[in-house]
Amino acid sequence: MSVLWTIGYEKLRPESLLAELQAAGVERVLDVRLRPQSRKPGMSKTRLGGTLALGGIAYEHRRELGTPPELRELYRSASSEKHARAAAGFREHLEAHERAAVDALAAELADGTAPKTALLCLEEDHEVCHRSVVAEALTERVPGLEVVHL
């Protein structure tokens, strides 16, 4: 059985994020933010990639798995109804526009040679983050894929 981890760095410092990923045995982080910049120190693409590399974890930005701007506002809302609409809209977006990217990642995970992988985004709560939709799309394509939310 393959495992896919997800993690949100919202309340973590770079060293805490690294420690949590290492404790889980993660070998590769796929940053699924559309834009890999952050106001949080150390969490933008270059610095984050450097920190992870020092800890033996590979970093890749997968822009195509990021949330389109028109859905981002729905995710930011405190409304569970808007979160559900955002998730449904993002699911449709993935299937209509990024199916090849999801299929390619699924193939990587299914063949058993991919490094132990975590999807990374900002949001602490996976239930209100698009990374859960990406993970769900992957479980539909990879038999036996288990998702662990850190």
Tell me the role of every PLM-derived stretch.
Residues 1-150:
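Residues lining hydrophobic/aromatic ligand-binding pockets adjacent to catalytic sites
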